[in-house]
Amino acid sequence: MLFKEDKVARADAEAIRKGIGFYRWTHDLVEVTGRDALEVLQKIYISDLSKVPVGKSKYTASLDENGEIIDDVIVMHMADGLYWVSDLYGPRLLPWIDRHKGDADIHAKIITYDWDMY
């Protein structure tokens, strides 16, 4: 997950900065469910998400193995065992979750197109 090296996104941003154009950068929405959803999210993000009550959210970040920030997100606690993660790189978040979940009871999927986000 080398988010900061996304060459396509960087090229798009530079084109907009140097000219005129339309730039749509919608966050992805990832749904995380399962008995161990909180446990896995606690491994991935730096904030204590156990303190986020249902119906509330937390701005947080994830770090790589060197302690460098690789992404910042908003984690929304929708219900017991149900979280939504607002993330710019949803397709890259899914393998990151898989890498850290081990044998945990968790399922993650992109639900961006089920909801309009602006």
Role assignments for model-derived ranges:
Residues 1-70:
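Acidic, proline/glycine-enriched N-terminal capping motif
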Residues 21, 29, 74-118:
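Acidic, low-complexity central loop/insert segments
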